[in-house]
Swiss-Prot record:
Name of the protein described by the UniProt record: Cathelicidin-2
Record-level Gene Ontology MF annotations: lipopolysaccharide binding
Propeptide: 30-130, 174-176
Modified residues (Pyrrolidone carboxylic acid): 30
Example GO BP: antimicrobial humoral immune response mediated by antimicrobial peptide
Alphabetical UniProt keywords: Amidation, Antibiotic, Antimicrobial, Disulfide bond, Pyrrolidone carboxylic acid, Repeat, Secreted, Signal
Source taxonomy: Eukaryota, Metazoa, Chordata, Craniata, Vertebrata
Domain of life of the native organism: Eukaryota
Modified sites of kind Proline amide: 173
Post-translation changes: Elastase is responsible for its maturation.
Length: 176
């Protein structure tokens, strides 16, 4: 009797563990990584863009450390750069080379990690183009000439002038 009860209890536990094992991997497999969510947002930015060329992810700021539900919005910050591929191409932006002196944009906003909920709110602003200019060679700046420091010379201190002692000539009063 005890063995039947124990096997029934073991059967229930195995059923619960099996169900739990089936539910958890499917939920975690569906969630996108932070980088994948940003790449999807870049793809949608390219689709909605009216510019001639595609943009590709140039730099991704670190993900926030908080673990949240995949359906909630996560703040993102990244930089994209213009590629050589025209927007009409079917080629993924990751396979396109960056355009030399292409536009660079800083993007901030929110994305969700849930692939079924493709919501994102991203705003991109063009960064000032920073072009490399070789440094101008100028002669080194020399400080103005200053002679080495010398303390002021003081004349020696002399005692006040006293005439030399001369014994008196002649009889001295009080002496005989």
């Amino acid at each position: 009797m005890e063995t039947q009860g124990a096997s029934l209890s073991l059967g229930r536990w195995s059923l619960w563990l099996l169900l739990l094992g089936l539910v958890l991997p499917s939920a975690s497999a569906q969630a996108l990584s932070y980088r994948e969510a940003v790449l999807r947002a870049v793809g949608q930015l390219n689709e909605r863009s009216s510019e001639a060329n595609l943009y590709r992810l140039l730099e991704l700021d670190p993900a926030p450390n908080d673990e949240v539900d995949p359906g909630t919005r996560k703040p993102v910050s990244f930089t994209v750069k213009e590629t050589v591929c025209p927007r009409t191409t079917q080629q993924p932006p990751e396979e396109c080379d960056f355009k030399e002196n292409g536009l660079v944009k800083q993007c901030v906003g929110t994305v969700t990690l849930d692939p079924s909920n493709d919501q994102f709110d991203i705003n991109c602003n063009e960064l000032q183009s920073v072009r490399f200019r070789p440094p101008i060679r100028r002669p080194p700046i020399r400080p103005p000439f200053r002679p080495p420091f010398r303390p002021p010379v003081r004349p020696p201190i002399r005692p006040p002038f006293r005439p030399p002692f001369r014994p008196p000539i002649g009889p001295f009063p009080g002496r005989r």
